[in-house]
């Protein structure tokens, strides 16, 4: 009896292995030709060195990675419990494998395999999908729009001179930063845990983006507030992005000093 392999049976879904990486990188290059080419170092920086771990699920055809669903986890304090929120990134299907499968297609099947493997590990999965992916996500994966993000822009004002103390640049995060975050988090329902490992990975040792971490100090030298400015986040002359802000809600005078240019 002659047996043929159906198109669906061609694919194996599993976690990424070390020997898959070259193929994964090549498929990513084909799927995102407008993006900067990611190399092995960039992959490990994004998905292996993350102190919260990694979530990489691939669809393999033969020895070739032809689809992928990936998320970057982040440890989050939710109430009194630490959980993981995951930012979905680098979800893709090789151009030569996007046709010929009935709905739900290879993208959805890869995502379903991802959630079968990792779904119970995380409290939230979120992202900013392109329009086509958003339609698929809402139809097959039960994604919902939480809100539309806005870009808030303002001019920096002059120093009010109302608060005492210094603003200095930090080059590393000590335990005092974590203690400041814990003070702030008491009033927040959910907040990324800003420990030294996270801040080092996210800001201080980022290989391709420049961040300036500013600390507001009290007159006795203790840490009162912190903000992070992204130098390369916004493509506009003279513009900078405020990418993190740690100031206790009941200490507005610290916020005034942190806003000083």
Task: Annotate each PLM feature.
Residues 2-60, 65, 87, 160-197, ...:
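Short amphipathic alpha-helix that is part of the acyltransferase structural core
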Residues 43-47, 69-71, 128, 143-145, ...:
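Tryptophan-centric aromatic hotspots in well-structured domains and transmembrane helices
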Residues 47-61, 67, 121-122, 203-214:
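A short helix-loop-beta-strand connector motif used in the catalytic cores of GNAT acetyltransferases and
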Residues 56-58, 64-74, 87, 215, ...:
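Conserved beta-strand in the GNAT
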Residues 77-148, 234-261:
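Acyl-donor binding region in acyl/amide transferases
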Residues 139-164:
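Alpha-helical membrane-targeting segments
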Residues 202-250, 254-255:
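Long, well-ordered mid-to-C-terminal structural blocks that present hydrophobic/aromatic surfaces
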């Amino acid at each position: 009896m002659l047996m043929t392999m159906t198109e669906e049976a061609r694919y194996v879904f599993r976690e990424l292995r070390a020997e898959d990486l070259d193929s994964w990188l090549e498929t990513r290059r084909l799927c995102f030709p407008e993006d900067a080419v990611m190399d092995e170092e960039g992959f490990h920086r994004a998905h292996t060195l993350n102190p919260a771990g990694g979530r990489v699920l691939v669809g393999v055809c033969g020895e070739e990675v032809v689809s992928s669903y990936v998320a970057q986890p982040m440890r989050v304090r939710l109430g009194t419990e630490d959980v993981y929120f995951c930012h979905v990134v680098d979800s893709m299907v090789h151009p030569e494998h996007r046709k010929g499968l009935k709905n739900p297609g290879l993208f959805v099947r890869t995502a379903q395999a991802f959630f079968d493997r990792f779904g119970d590990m995380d409290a939230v999965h979120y992202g900013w999908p392109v329009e086509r992916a958003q339609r698929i996500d809402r139809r097959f994966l039960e994604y919902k729009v939480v809100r539309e993000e806005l870009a808030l822009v303002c001019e920096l004002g002059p120093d009010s001179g109302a608060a005492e103390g210094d603003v200095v640049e930090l080059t590393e995060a000590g335990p005092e930063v974590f203690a400041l975050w814990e003070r702030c988090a008491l009033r927040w329902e959910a907040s990324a845990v800003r420990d030294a490992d996270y801040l080092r990975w996210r800001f201080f040792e980022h290989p391709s983006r420049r961040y300036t971490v500013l600390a507001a100090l009290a007159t006795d030298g203790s840490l009162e507030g912190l903000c992070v400015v992204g130098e390369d986040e916004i493509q506009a002359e003279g513009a900078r992005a405020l990418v993190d802000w740690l100031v206790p809600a009941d200490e507005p005078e610290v916020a005034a000093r942190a806003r000083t240019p």
